[in-house]
Amino acid sequence: MSSIRWALVGTSDFALEWIAPALARAKGSSLAAVVSRDRSRAAAAAAQVGAAEAYASIEAIDRDLVDGVVLVTPNSAHGAGAIAALQRGLHVIVEKPMSHTVAECEQMIAAAETSGAMLAVAHCMEWAPPIVAARELLERSVIGRVHRARIGASFLAEPGSLRRDGVAPASGDAARFGALFDMGVHAIDTINRLLGPVAIVRSVRTDTGDADAVAELQLASGAAVELSSRWSADENFLEIVGTNGVLRSREWWGREFAGHLEIEQSGATEQVPLRRANVYDAQLSHLSDAASGRCAPATSARRGAVNVAVIEAVVRSARSGESAPVSAPRGRLG
């Protein structure tokens, strides 16, 4: 199969302005269709982004014309959408977070194992230039053994918004999903990827609706990490302290950017050269290759489930006031 024909599920501004163009540009990828519950909305969006087909549901997708779906839907719809697509043999890329519970992540993984189709999670900061460079430096042990780190992924929400006020309604997506599921999952995924798995967490602060969260993470390696994710401030920092130096970034996350990374050793600081990149282009090129069977997906389903497990542990810790272990999700996929 020379190119994976993707259907974009969702018609948000983010889906149409960022993901659709990236699907069209990515190597080994083509944008074949748009899916929305409103068929006329799907048709209008398809015309806007240059897709030939429009469908009102995943079940309506013509399997002769589409190989996989990219789910850019509300968090609460991720599980049902992924399982429906996998049951039809469609490859799935699901936006982060993978789901709102580990239990549903496990159901998604089971569906993928049964179908044989790819299930991957859109943890796009895997391809952020500062993270790519930091990973290479850490793999070479340039700063020695890591013993502590801190990371922030936050933004200042608009005044009057649910995010800014930090008051969750009684039901719906916003009641279940807050800053940790929004930007915090990027930080959790980055720590898991760069420094190894999180073993134990202690929630220092989680406000109502999870609008302002701070947690201490103890890694399996013994390193300690302070993580913050808020809707009350702009935060974009990463610091990794090792026995032989420090890596620092004042811009590690973004969409189309070069970012910043520097290394401090023996009292001298050197900036690491970075090239501007669109994280979605790189992500969708890689995952199209993975769907074609040319490689394993870097942002695997299991990786997505592990990140949700860390968030669940933070929530348990916030409720109990005590440290909480991170439970490994079931399933072998990824």
Where are these regions (language model features)?
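Predominantly a Rossmann-like dinucleotide-binding segment in NAD(P)-dependent oxidoreductases
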Residues: M125-R202, G321
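Contiguous beta-strand/loop segments that form the cofactor/metal-binding neighborhood of enzyme cores
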Residues: D182, I188-G254, L284-C295, G331-G334
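N-terminal Rossmann-like dinucleotide-binding module
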Residues: M1-V49
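Basic phosphate/pyrophosphate-binding loop/patch that engages nucleotide-derived ligands
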Residues: A110-M118, V132-R148, G222, G242
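Hydrophobic residues in well-ordered beta-strands that form the structural core
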Residues: A15, V94, L119-V121, L227, ...
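C-terminal helix-rich "cap/oligomerization" subdomain common to oxidoreductases
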Residues: M1, A60, G68-V70, D289-G334
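Beta-loop-alpha module in the N-terminal Rossmann-like domain of NAD(P)-dependent dehydrogenases
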Residues: V49-A111
